[in-house]
Amino acid sequence: KLPDRAPCFLSFESGIYLSNPEFCFVQLARSCSVIDLIKLGFELCGTYRIDPASSIGFRPAQPLSSTEAINRFIDKMHGKVPRKAKTAIRYVCDGSASPMETCLALLLGLPARYGGYGLGMPEMNAKVLIPARLGKRTTYRKYHCDLYWSEQNVAIEYNSREFHVNELAVERDASRINNLKAAGIEALAVTRAHVADNVKFDAIAHSAASLMGKRIRIAYVDIDERRMSLRKQLFSKDPWC
């Protein structure tokens, strides 16, 4: 029996009801791994949807839920929630704009026991103000960091282009990093090639940790196997099974 104070269904049409996004998250905790459930949470709370019909595998969309809404739903269930759901929601972030941003956040942010580098979960597409001089005045414009660790003032910008098309693209990417540095934010650029190569990505993770004033400790003797397992789960073709 479901608690009355935790509405679980949305009316689709006369006599037909669908599980709401928060209830979907809890229901799938019974069949998904923790990692797959976190990925689902990122998609529910993000601005993209997995779409096999799209040439890039996803499409822009409005968030279906939020970490606040899922946590509130879990609280109202009064213990009638799988422990896996309570574990997974701790690592879900609002605002991811793409599957690769989600994967980057999990690779870098998750604890070592799950195969991550343990840097802590970032804010996704966080808004920051970039200073710009206009005569004698300093003005500010809004800017969004793909991944941002606000306490350490460190950002990671993901460049989805495998190769730069022209010099203008190179200039634009360099400008993004320079603009963040002008705001006092240490920034690193990451490409698909970095993510695909274990050695290159390890270097990125250690660089990010250094900027944060952290050390990546090897907490498990099988850490390489844990990291490989996480990669397999993140980049599998059928993520919700």
Regions found by a protein language model. Name each.
Residues 1-81, 112, 219-241:
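Short gly/ser-rich loop at a beta-strand->alpha-helix junction or flexible surface loop bordering the NTP-binding
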